[in-house]
Amino acid sequence: VAGGSDITLQGKVYAQSDVVLGAGSVNVKDGEIRTHRNNADTYADKKAADAYRKQLVNVSPSATVAKALGDGHIALAAVGVSSAEKPFETKGAIVIDKAYIDAAGGDISIASSAERNGGNLMGSKADASVEISNATIQGQNVAISAETKVSGKVGSADAYKTGAEEDGILGLLHATFDEQVGSLASVVKTGADSRVTVKDSTLTAAKDLAISSKAESEIGSETGGALGVGINVGIADVSSKVEIQGTSVLTAEKDLAISAEGSNAIDLQRQGSAEDLPIA
């Protein structure tokens, strides 16, 4: 697991237990991931596990090897982080291209997520994506998801301090009036973008297959401010979609669910008052 960095897999991974890959960006290209799990817990299975452990220890005496086979799950996770080049954007991405992923007796989870707290005039964005093309993915339960959440407060000091780095007027206002400026010219912009794309791929689940995209944006007000006048403006862009393209085939022995959900909430109030503004 490498938080905030990139992982690229182009080789083969054969595991007797679980496989977990986690980073800010996960790429599986021309790669293969297979797992096996101990279903019956029989003497033969235990003996095979013991032999496997001994082989690993012989290769690497310092290796730490599990005493029992795992469930054979496969999990790919991308957790978005911001970068120095784009400090106001949080992005998580998973790309699976020309790959074979098989959890013989376990579940498969492919999840990309991004969360961003604190909006500003220049825009604060969370972006999560899963792109699958020319791939074969099969397991017991298969879940593929992209989820983003972004929030901000209009009139907060943070909005001014962040905006001050990019806008001379806001910087001058904040430097002169500090907290007293309240929401004199307070503008917050946020964006949440989630998407899952499956193209020319085969997805098979012995039980349930679920593909989902969810994007959520919330903008609230920071009440208070000595001046108590001005205008609050909240701008929120939300996009959530699932696309099944080309020759893709989706099969589930039980339930197959595809969903895309987006929510956008803006709650703006007058400075120093609990009364809602008539516009948002």
Predicted regions: what is each one?
Residues 1-280:
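Low-complexity, glycine- and small/polar-enriched segments
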